[in-house]
Amino acid sequence: TSSLVGSEMCIRDRIYGAMLAGGSGTRVKSSKIPKQFIEIGGKPIIIYTLENMLKVKRFDYIYIAVHKDYENYMNEQVKKNIPESEKVRIILGGKERMDTINNVTTAITNDNGIHDDDVIVIHDAVRPFVTEKILNDSIDCAAEYGACVCGLPCADTILHSKGGEYVEDIPVRSELYSGQAPDSFRLAHFIQMQDNLTEEQKKVITGTSQICTMNNQPIHLIEGDAINFKITTDSDLLIVRTLLGGK
């Protein structure tokens, strides 16, 4: 947001949400469409996620990257369900996760430029119950430390097995956390780390915070929430339907 003061333009740093929604979601066997677009109670899951993100009024814009086959559908759903649709930008995702992330950061900088302390909060479309606390903590943490991920201490013992037949190792559980989303960053810092990646590194990234570890950059950890789970399987989908009142 900018305002004219005297003859100078005063521009504050901005906070962007980003939602990655270009995946195919093959582990939900009961649906032929990507899980983020499965409708519950007349709305796709991604809209529930967006509604929770928009509860945080600090976001200037939220960018949603979707597959081209769902671009028109997503635009229609936003217009139908989101009163603050002027805050939402629908863009096309890429072939791989890193391509999609690059499309998001490129769209943001093309639309708005880039300022020193802009923050980007990158969330999964299939974590519809993200809380305001997680989002606000993520913004604050990224602004202070540059990079932030939320996670929970592992409740189960983790078994390391290369082939799924024998246990190779049992890591110390007290040192293990289950990573969630969002992953949040100072935008300029994040873009610089993106640019530093090799093509080989880009192909193996499964989580956004890996961009930091591949750049040997520290990531601050904040506490997640069990309700902020990712919809991965049919069992998860059943839980979501129950939490949304059996819709």
Give names to the regions the model predicted.
Residues 120:
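Short aromatic/hydrophobic "clamp" motif used to bind/position activated sugar donors
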Residues 129-222:
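Conserved core of the sugar-phosphate nucleotidyltransferase
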Residues 228-247:
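Hydrophobic helical membrane-anchoring modules
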Residues 4, 39, 129, 184, ...:
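Short aromatic/basic micro-patch
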Residues 19, 46, 104, 123-124, ...:
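Residue-level signal for inorganic ion chemistry
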